[in-house]
Amino acid sequence: MAQVLVVTNRKGGSGKTSTSVNLAAEFAANGRRVLLIDLDTQGHCAIGLGVKAQKDTPTVHGFFDGRHPLSSAIRETPWEGLHLIPADPLFDHGSGSKEELLLRQALASEGILGTHDIIIIDTPPSLDILLLNALYAADRVLVPFIPHFLAGEGVRQLARVLFRVGSRRANEGTRLLVGYVPVKVNLSMASGHKFPS
């Protein structure tokens, strides 16, 4: 059964997509069956993997809008063992289901957890229903952050959401493992030596 890793941060430009794409490619290069789900409507995971956008193809956002099953959006990539569920750049964040467990239920009920070793979910820099769906589906959360004082506020906002989700999951008997990874570290600057608290 697949482990689900969510890569998230409240702040845009924090390296979420680069981290997601590179981890997915590395896991696939090491023989793992990987599925990368792009919840960010910018659609940069597809670009990073060399997958061309195709009109009227199923997307993760079409799943949230109820247009098709999640499994119908799985696409091949040029990387052996690496699949992608692409984003829809025209998705309206106000539309779609408000159910927080929709993604978790679909991953299980559609058999997606059994056909992959690792599922990586790249999230948008927002605190919305898509992020909550990702977090409730997750086994692990990775928070890339730039060690700079402005990035600290986004991490603090996300920590409150992680606490809420973690508390609910603890009541269900499951745990959410969270890790932080500094990115874009400049060791010649003082901020590269200290992490925000």
Give the positions of each predicted feature.
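P-loop NTP-binding core
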Residues: 1-197
